[in-house]
């Protein structure tokens, strides 16, 4: 399986006061269903146990991070390995947070880092649905997600990013935030999306950037049925019908001006740009409820933690 290396932006001060954490999880298909078969951890990142609200074939896992946010000097690394035929649904109990960064660099680096990597073997299935990420005013965040899969894997996943707390008069103006999302299929890069926000580049306000919106999000869907495969010779018709269903759902939710859908190398890319994280999440859930039966042959069963 491909292993990728993320190059962090340069450190401007000698690292001090760091809190490094990593969590590596392995999920395997066993005679009793998908099981968490290996765990390696250091620091505050953890999981308790797998939940099975829809039966043994799909494990629901909640990532726990007791500090509830990332501060300057923190570096969190998360690695998820989904073995052949295993099925994982991965989520978090609450919002992730990049807090205001330290300004005094004599006590340590200002940057806050989270690096996540999913490795999917053949016929593996992974659904990655974290709660929203809140980036506070004055943050200095770097957040990356790499997905490595095969042409027979299935991946459904989203990320929802909220800039500042505008309802509390904490507008995101001076902060810095870089987000990098990549997807590799059979070691070939098919999707690369990067946004780097800083006071100097005006992407927050620019019409070709966020155009003043405070919430941006992406929903990715990849499955054999969506790309060229001899077993799916009627792919163009299926794909067209699926896109039409998604557009109809977006229209029914009156979200045409906030949501776009594109197809890149068999990967469906659905984007939201607006001001309301909850609106975005509910819309993405409705799209998941549409996509899951078609791509995974399973009805959508929401994680219990979403209702607490």
Curated annotation (Swiss-Prot):
Record's GO cellular component terms: cytoplasm
Keyword match Chaperone: yes
Record family assignment: Belongs to the UreD family.
Gene Ontology molecular function: nickel cation binding
Described function: Required for maturation of urease via the functional incorporation of the urease nickel metallocenter.
Matching PANTHER family: UREASE ACCESSORY PROTEIN D
Protein name: Urease accessory protein UreD
Subcellular location: Cytoplasm
Keywords, ordered alphabetically: Chaperone, Cytoplasm, Nickel insertion
InterPro entries, A to Z: UreD (IPR002669)
Subunit structure: UreD, UreF and UreG form a complex that acts as a GTP-hydrolysis-dependent molecular chaperone, activating the urease apoprotein by helping to assemble the nickel containing metallocenter of UreC. The UreE protein probably delivers the nickel.
Organism, scientific name: Psychromonas ingrahamii (strain DSM 17664 / CCUG 51855 / 37)
Source species, domain of life: Bacteria
Principal location: cytoplasm
